[in-house]
């Protein structure tokens, strides 16, 4: 993520403690977050108050994920710090300008968001498996894709 770092260093930083609710349904964020460390969960609550995790945001993933494209749309889900999180605070007007001035950083952010989308597809694929053993195997694949780091540029 070297190409994003010059942009992220220009942004203010805010910390959240594990368990902090960052956004609630109906909030219209005035800023976006880019986690520099830690994990933010996106979840919904059913009518019994049971949380249902939808997806997690890790390093360099936009929160809310549609914020850059639709900055004035209210969020539909809860966003909560799963771990202690340090985030860059992206201003609605300034952040797109910074990205447009650095095409390599913009491309890198696109790759990060694409990776997140692929992970979401794996998670959905996991949930629709009819057999428990298949759910476990697909969940393992999802976890490997989502949280593992490449050990070599030639090894996924």
Identify the residue ranges that each predicted region occupies.
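Cyclic-nucleotide recognition modules
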Residues: 53-114, 118
